[in-house]
């Protein structure tokens, strides 16, 4: 059995790479169709011991976990039981090859599902990995519309690493203020910012105004929990001398997080559904939209329990860490660890954050990127003011989605459904990223970056100063419909001299990537998936304020689109004329 000790690390790597080679030889035989019937509705819940309204599925929060094997077809019958709101669900990390209408992005891939209506999502899960799903209309993710989506290897195949058990962890942040009040505040003049979350939730559970670790700090109020409450910690039950895989996904609306387990090193083996070169770390930073798998070995004192701690990074930590226990059975969960929880690194220690992120490279045998690209787009994200409203913009364009979904508008050639002028592909060379923007040319827009099928595209994400002096924030960017190679990161403005530093040897494949303050991030992808795809900051209020773009490729090759997906806006009339 695999041990976590350093002396066994080389043997583990050999097994890992051997297994990886076997994994790439998988077939699609024996795939299944997995059916789910979901009702989405608001309900009373107490995620952090304070009763509130959450958006749940079938009376559950978080929503039910989808578990399938690679090659399986997933069919979700989604019934909207919200009384006054539409709804969609995005299957984060699922590529939707052949089913771009099922991507679950309102105004891009489909119409919102109206109250009382039913919509069938039908798609194939291609690759094994750790994924999740969430609402993609307004700020419904912040309201609790999310859940886990786990894809195992095809039937009869195994992962390229051994483990004895598995723990699934979905991380989120929680506000006591309703999403409707948050949305109105973000769209007000002057803006009313949402503030930091009240609580970090681990599998939908957290504690507000009390701490399960109060015995180490007299300033904290101890939690008085029986264990059956919806806010009681989700305990990680483990047996001694075993290896466990912990799947970690972050569906936070705002918070960047740090995950650590007391006395237990983490072996990182997967990121965003792709295998990575394994490496040990004491903790991981995880940004909204990212997912990881880590292996731990329960080789510590078996008579003790150990802290699991999730703290905030990248923003001033006004939110207490989320806590739970790694419970070595048969110990009682009431037995607290002898030491306090791991201390979260300083929120503004970006060098530490970069050190972790830069260590992530592709596992041996992973697909390599094309040597050269056909097209390069530079995207500068800035915070701006438009007619007195605070917005986020990309190359001076703040995204406002049209009422007719792009997929249908382009499929039926509806030229007036959105701006036919493509957005800028570059920003001024003399732009000073170290000073606040001037806001002179910023506008609202909904144009599309269109690619030829097979085109190899580089995107350089460029960060800059916000409206307040000496302030730049972390932004995690998520691309729908594709995985991309992360070619590199850097400080300051990207220049031609940076070209030689790009990693073409073993860049990791991801679907979400971070851009650090005052820095740049370079990615490469192949436009080989016909459809229309969002590319946006995964921080919920930033997208709400316009921080995103739209990519399209080969829409003419998209097959039949279900009528209900396009029964709104200009496409509704087109469906009548072109049944």
UniProtKB/Swiss-Prot annotation:
Gene3D superfamilies given in the database record: Cupredoxins - blue copper proteins (2.60.40.420)
Cellular component annotations (GO), alphabetically ordered: extracellular region; plasmodesma
CDD domains referenced in this protein's UniProt entry, alphabetically: CuRO_1_AAO (cd13845), CuRO_3_AAO (cd13893)
Stored InterPro entries: Cu-oxidase-like_N (IPR011707), Cu-oxidase_2nd (IPR001117), Cu-oxidase_C (IPR011706), Cu-oxidase_fam (IPR045087), Cu_oxidase_CS (IPR033138), Cu_oxidase_Cu_BS (IPR002355), Cupredoxin (IPR008972), CuRO_1_AAO (IPR034259)
Annotated Cu cation 4 binding sites: 475, 537, 542, 547
Compartments where located: Secreted
Cofactor binding note from Swiss-Prot or TrEMBL: Binds 4 Cu cations per monomer.
Record-listed Cu cation 2 binding positions: 92, 134, 538
EC number: 1.10.3.3
Binding site for Cu cation 1: 90, 478
Signal sequence bounds: 1-30
Catalytic activities: 4 L-ascorbate + O2 = 4 monodehydro-L-ascorbate radical + 2 H2O
Top-rank lineage group of the source organism: Eukaryota
Listed GO MF terms: copper ion binding; L-ascorbate oxidase activity
Binding site for Cu cation 3: 136, 480, 536
Cofactor(s) named in the record: Cu cation
Alphabetic keyword roster: Copper, Disulfide bond, Glycoprotein, Metal-binding, Oxidoreductase, Repeat, Secreted, Signal
Keyword set includes Secreted: yes
Disulfide bonds: 49-231, 111-568, 210-223
Domain Plastocyanin-like: 33-152, 164-330, 374-553
Glycosylation sites: 122, 355, 470
Oligomer and partners: Dimer.
Similarity remark: Belongs to the multicopper oxidase family.
Protein name: L-ascorbate oxidase
Gene (UniProt): AAO
């Amino acid at each position: 059995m695999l041990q976590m000790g350093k002396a066994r690390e080389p043997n583990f790597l050999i097994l890992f790479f051997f297994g990886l080679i076997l994994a790439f030889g998988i077939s699609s035989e024996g795939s299944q169709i997995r059916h789910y019937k979901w009702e989405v509705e608001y309900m009373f819940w107490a995620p952090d011991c304070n009763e509130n309204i959450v958006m749940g599925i079938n009376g559950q929060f978080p929503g039910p976990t989808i578990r399938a094997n690679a090659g399986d077809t997933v069919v979700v019958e989604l019934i909207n039981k919200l009384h006054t709101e539409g709804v969609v669900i995005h299957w984060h990390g699922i590529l939707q090859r052949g089913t771009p209408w099922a991507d679950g992005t309102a105004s891009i891939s489909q119409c919102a599902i109206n109250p009382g209506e039913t919509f069938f999502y039908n798609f194939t899960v291609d690759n094994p990995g750790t994924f999740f799903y969430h609402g993609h209309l307004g700020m419904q993710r912040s309201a609790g519309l999310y859940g886990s989506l786990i894809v195992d290897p095809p039937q009869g195949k195994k992962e390229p690493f051994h483990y004895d058990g598995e723990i699934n962890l979905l991380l989120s942040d929680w506000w006591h203020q309703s999403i409707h009040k948050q949305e109105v505040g973000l769209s007000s003049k002057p803006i009313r910012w949402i503030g930091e979350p009240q609580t970090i939730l681990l599998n939908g559970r957290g504690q507000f105004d009390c701490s399960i670790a109060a015995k180490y700090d007299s300033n904290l109020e101890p939690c008085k929990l029986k264990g059956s409450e919806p806010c009681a910690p989700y305990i990680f039950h483990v047996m001694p001398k075993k290896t466990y895989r912990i799947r970690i996904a972050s569906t936070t609306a705002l918070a960047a997080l740090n995950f650590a387990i007391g006395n237990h090193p983490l072996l990182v083996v997967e990121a965003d559904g792709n295998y990575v070169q394994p490496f040990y770390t004491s903790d991981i930073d995880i940004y909204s939209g990212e997912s990881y798998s880590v292996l731990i070995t329960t080789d510590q004192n078996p008579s003790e329990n150990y802290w699991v701690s999730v703290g905030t990074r990248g923003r001033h930590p006004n939110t207490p860490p989320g806590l739970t226990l790694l419970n070595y059975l048969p110990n009682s969960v009431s037995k607290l660890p002898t030491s306090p929880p791991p201390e979260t690194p300083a929120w503004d220690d970006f060098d530490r954050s970069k050190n972790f992120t830069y260590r992530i490279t592709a596992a041996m045998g992973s697909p390599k990127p094309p040597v050269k690209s056909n097209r390069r787009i530079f995207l500068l994200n800035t915070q701006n003011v438009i007619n007195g409203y605070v917005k986020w913009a990309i190359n001076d364009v703040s995204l406002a989605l049209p009422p007719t979904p792009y997929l249908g508008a382009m499929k039926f050639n509806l030229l007036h459904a959105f701006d036919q002028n493509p957005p800028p592909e570059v920003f001024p060379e003399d732009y000073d990223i170290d000073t606040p923007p001037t806001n002179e040319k910023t506008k609202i827009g909904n144009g599309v970056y269109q690619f030829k099928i097979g085109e190899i595209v580089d995107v350089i994400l460029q960060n800059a100063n916000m409206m307040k002096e000496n302030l730049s924030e972390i932004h995690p960017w998520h691309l729908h419909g594709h995985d991309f190679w992360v070619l590199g990161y850097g400080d300051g403005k990207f220049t031609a001299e940076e070209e030689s530093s790009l990693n073409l040897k073993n860049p990791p494949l991801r679907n979400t990537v971070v851009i650090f303050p005052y820095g740049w991030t370079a990615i490469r992808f192949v436009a080989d998936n016909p459809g229309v795809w969002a590319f946006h900051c995964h921080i919920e209020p930033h997208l709400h304020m316009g921080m995103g773009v739209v990519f399209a490729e080969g829409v003419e090759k998209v097959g039949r689109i279900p009528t209900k997906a396009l029964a709104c806006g200009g496409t509704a009339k087109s469906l009548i004329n072109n049944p």
